[in-house]
Amino acid sequence: TVSYEYDSMHRMTSSTNAKGGVTQFAYDERGNQTSVTDPSGYTWISSYDLANQLIGRTDPEGKATKYTYNLAGRLLSRTKPGERTAAVTYDKNYNVISLTDPKGYVYSYTYDKDNRQTEGKDPLKQSVKTAYDPGSCVTAVTDKMGLMEQYEYDPHGNIIQRTDTKGLHTRFQYDILDNLTSVTDPM
């Protein structure tokens, strides 16, 4: 049996596992979880800015991870001890246009006028491209090897056929309520 306790604000304050181990949770006056102490007594501490965004987390060994955000509240960076900073950049519509991982590898993304991701490139500049119909349904995905998978839809937006990179078709059928009723795999 696992049991839970809550405070007057309906926030979990403790959980007791089947072996009797208790994990405790603490919160600040704004409801942000500020600490978690596991059954072994190890504590993780979290801190927040005035916008209630997580800006730091310290593990039981005292190693602190830091987070930064832009004015719109979107994550800009995460810095862990002993690692490079992982970073995110956005376009004017807040689409992610690049991710830099802790190893320094950069992934980039492009979007169409409707803010749909049309291409993603890995650190080696190998890309995956995505095409859409006017209703924003994905019609094709071309992988980094240039192989294309295609999709067809009914007027309700239900996928009715998927053509894989080998040209094999998987067909989908729906009832009048748009519930999937059958899938026919390629033979």
Indicate residue ranges for each PLM-predicted region:
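Beta-strand elements of repeat-based all-beta scaffolds
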Residues: 1-17, 21-38, 42-59, 63-80, ...
